[in-house]
Amino acid sequence: MNRTPVHAQAGTTMPEVLVAAIILAVFFGSIFELNAVCLRYIDASKESMAALQLVNDRNETLRNLAFSDLTNSSYVQNLLSSPANASEFAKKATEVVKISAYPTASGVTQFTRSATGTVTTDSVAANLGSTLVQVDVAVSWMMSLGTRARSEQVTSIISNGTKK
C-alpha cells in the first residue's frame, strides 16, 4: 500500500494576525504617548527656568538702582511698566514687588505687574528708611502642564551705599 503522506501546511490564522496587529498598535501608541509626556515635561521645565530668570532679572534691575530711586514709589512703578526681560514667558506671568524697611518694617510698598503689563500700586509704606530695605520679587503663572498655579520668589536686602 502506497500512501502519500499528508503534510499539514503551517500558517497563521486571521485571529493571530489581528492579535499581533493590536499588540503592535498598542506598543507604538504607548511610545508616542510617552514622547508627548516627555515634551510636556520639557515645556514645564522651560517655564520654570524662564520664571527663575525673570525673577532674577527684575531683582538685578532693582538692586542696581540708586537707593533714592529704589525708595521712590513712582520711579519703581514706572520701571515696572516694562517687562523684566524680552522672553515670551513675561507675557503670561504676574510680577509682585514688595519693598519694606529692614529690619523693622513700617509698612510695605507693593506693586503688581499683570501679564498684560498693567502696573498697580497695592500699598505704599509710610517710611522705607534710609539705610536698608528688603526687596521681595515674586512671579506667579499658570503652568502649561496640568494648569497648576506656580510661583518663584527671591528676597534681597539692599543697603544705601556706594556702587562700585
Which residues fall in each region the model found?
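Aliphatic-rich helix starts adjacent to a transmembrane/signal segment
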Residues: 8, 12-56, 65
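Low-complexity, Gly/Pro-rich coil/beta segments used as flexible assembly/activation regions
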Residues: 45-164
